[in-house]
Amino acid sequence: MKKRILTLLAAVCLLSAVLSGCGGGSQNGTTGTTDQSTANTQTEGPAARAAAGELNVGIAQDLDSSLDPHKTVKAGTREVMFNVFEGLLKPDASGNLNPAVAESYTVSEDHLLYTFKLRTGVKFHNGQEVTPEDVIWSYQRCGDANAPADIIQVAAFANVEMYQEGDDTVCFQLQEPNNEFASYLTTAVLPKDYTEQDTAPVGTGPFRFVSRTAQDS
């Protein structure tokens, strides 16, 4: 699988993060003839960087000190980390919720039981395969009133029973119907036993985190 590099340069506070993406590289379809000066310009300009799999994107603010998606509060950080992490569900460009880490899910007629089947073979960027335990830990972490103060609490998870069925299924038993509950399941799924999310975040998204360099112009 080819890798492409995404370098994010903060335009105001000037912070650089580098992400590496999985997927096919960009294609350069330029035709026709050019003189030597034009060719040199193309070689040194954005087209050459794109051909090498690199993209520079400016954002208007510095990133949070922590890159753990359960701790980030700044919009710029969330936009960057959106490409690194996925929840059971993930919104598309139109705001529709689609399965991500999950393959499929069902909701009971009384809207109290949500049952998710995990997608087979989904791995975190460190090579570890996603398990139901990772999913449950991630969402319980955000619903635990006794969690560290820097964890952003998701009230919708507070009184929900979460449990595993078999090797690939996670269930959420609500105490009362919540029509918005599915939207909260876009919360990032993290590896339970990984402890470096603040500085070296690991998710399942289309891009993986490579590096972060503060004050890089």
Say what each PLM segment does.
Residues 1-54, 96, 161, 195-197:
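Short, low-complexity disordered leader/linker segments with a strong preference
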Residues 58-107, 140, 202-204:
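N-terminal lobe/hinge region of extracytoplasmic solute-binding protein
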Residues 67, 97, 157, 189, ...:
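Short clusters of hydrophobic/aromatic residues that line enzyme substrate/ligand-binding pockets
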